[in-house]
Amino acid sequence: MMRAERRQMGYISWKDLDPDEERRVLRTSSPSTEDIYLPDLVRIGAASGEVQEDLCLLVGSAAQRRRILGVSWSVCSGLPAGSILEVEPGVYSLSPEALCVAVAREVGCIQAFALAQELCSKISLSDRGKYLPPYTSPVTNKLAKDKDQPADVGYFEVEPVLTPDRLADYLAVCKGNAAKQLQRLCPYLSENLRSPMECIMLALFSLPFSYGGFACGPFKTDCKIEFDDRAQAISGMPHAVCDAYQEAARFDLEYNGELGHSSRRGRIHDEKRNTGLITMGIEVATVNNEMLCDMEAMEALAWRMHQRMRKRYRNRVDARRKKQEALLNTLRACFGLKPV
């Protein structure tokens, strides 16, 4: 439902509730069969109308549950302020922050991290993703080559609806191990990413060794580098914008997708930009989909980044390659991609 709202509006237009109203909604929520009208659910994006799926409803106590075919229940007696939004009169949804916590508790912390990264980025997936309700969409596939996954898995350009700081503040008042574990991962979230593959790349290079990442963060995304006179003369540009800039390493990490980079004009622009950055003493590495699936190559790139930071690359995690591959495939699943 949240993805459907972002696709249709470009943002979330739902109404915030004050804490008293949130408690009242949770306390009095007790839906019956008569309250669940499929056309309305399809209209607001809570159901597709084409795929048989369970509807998950939140109530404040076990006594509020009802035996309804096709409905599963989640029970929570209390939620922090800012957990519930009003979709329309009588219909409510978890906020982006609360949804991330729910996914962390019910599915896993990395899956919740991936969802949080999507919500912090300028993308919204179609609902073919594994961890939110399915939704059939004819959107053109923008993720990779057509052979890599079905053509109806794609993404939409929208505005972010969450920030890492907002999520961290919310998690600070949440109870439970899942919330605390997700809170520890908030510093590794990035903002304003523009494609699912950028999200996967930044997660791999930012997350700690213990999760299967390369511990190269933090990165500044959409970072504007002003060129000096020499760099301007060489590149013909006043500045460059880096996808992911590691300031301590003076290192720019770029994802080179199929769109916008394969044309002659795109190649010339990238060459000028990269030459200008190199003139400024900034090393540039370009990663594509094939390279991102090669953990040995990515670890060599991470080693170079650590070297530029004047640090030793010390990944002493047992079976580290298996952890790295498991992290990659978990992230790919979250963004609707096949495992490698």
Label the model's feature ranges.
Residues 150-340:
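Surface segments flanking catalytic/ligand-binding clefts of nucleic-acid enzymes
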Residues 1-178, 317, 327-340:
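Short gly/ser-rich loop at a beta-strand->alpha-helix junction or flexible surface loop bordering the NTP-binding
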